[in-house]
Amino acid sequence: MAQLSDDCFAFGGPMMSVDEAVAIIATRVSAVREIEAVPIENADGRILAGDISASLALPPFTNSAVDGYAVRSDDLPLREGVAFPVSGRIQAGASAQQPVKPGHAVRIFTGAPMPEGADTVFMQEDVRVDEAGRVVLPAGLRPGANVRPAGEDIQLGAAALAGGLRLRPQDVALAAAFGLTQIDVRRRIRVAVFSTGNELASPGSPRKSAQLYDSNRFMLMAMLARLGCEVSDLGILRDDRGALAQGLKKAAGTHDLILTSGGVSTGEEDHVKAAVEDVGTLVLWRMAIKPGRPVAMGIIAGTPFIGLPGNPVASFVTFVHVVRPTVLALSGAQPQPLIPMPVRAAFTYKKKIARREYVRVNLRKAPDGVGLEAVKFPREGAGLLSSLVDTDGLVELGEEITQVAPGQTVGFLGYASLT
């Protein structure tokens, strides 16, 4: 099980910046150690356990890049219309049977190995075959044209894939090109997910008139699944300090991370912070971020705990910027910083200094046809699920920014990039 050191970070006073909070969490979590071999067809999205070096040069042999005719560069014609006898034919997957004779050509196809002596290929579109079956070649082709040398892509023994990589389809393809059938990956981390609050009912169960159906839990579980986690749905914990403490302690024994939403603010019925202190240690609480200020992080029996706000937009935003990097660190993944795309603001906005804010926006083509501009969603409430559904992403406004004017360059994070 991933462990978190048991020293408490002194919180209070000014709210902590997002970067400070993430840095503190990063120093206190360690990656899961267990490694498992998975079939290569199941490796997409998993975290590579160790480096992979090229066990085979790519390509493993020198081959033709086009359909055409292979010749010796010493025989390249200096004038138009020189005819060469065709003394062989090599298809992809076949081996060259004999060297190319001086003054001869060999019919060759894309991917076929180059015959001994040949080092240049004429594209079939650039030649013609005369009545005698000879190939008539143009002048001016450079030596080595249209040939892929062995190891052109990757040399034998070269570093290919680095440990900690979150494997993508193209990474899986590279491993397959080396002939691998299995890949060693870190085991999936186990995450327990709770919602908290008497005001919540689970979908499919009776809902009282003053209750809402729980949506955060399913959003968070879906986001965790996209990050490759093994997720335990532990339902809804009621607003009872003792029950919360008991549920958190029980989850800590069998999971690598505990994640809750709701109950981390300062209201009389917000018991999560106190429950964490009853069974563990609170490391930090409250961040300078909007939406999402009430975020709690602690340790319970060595297991990291993160408590997110109950408002769905705040929960979404803080998941992206706090939970996501924590999950990657626990999983043994390389850091994957989010890189905002520069766009032009098509809105006016004012904010407090020293607080990072995220504005929900849609993208559209700029009126002058150059680049994209961000259009602010008309409503700002942190409880508006529709504001996440009906927008393309978030504009990130750093701590130093106090206002945004139309035409100003801002950073955009598309939802597709956030997990």
Language model features with spans:
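Short, low-complexity N-terminal leaders and the immediately following helix N-cap/first helix
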Residues: M1-R79, A333-Y358
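Structural signal for hydrophobic packing residues in well-ordered secondary-structure cores
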Residues: A26-R33, D51, M114, A158-G164, ...
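Generic structural signal for well-ordered, non-membrane alpha-helical segments
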Residues: P14, V18-V22, E36, I40, ...
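Helix-rich terminal scaffold detector
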Residues: M1-D19, T181-L308, P312-T318, A329
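Flexible glycine/proline-rich
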Residues: D19-V22, E36-E41, G50, G93, ...
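Short, glycine/charged-enriched hinge/interface segments at domain edges or termini
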Residues: A2-M16, Y69-D233, R238, E373, ...
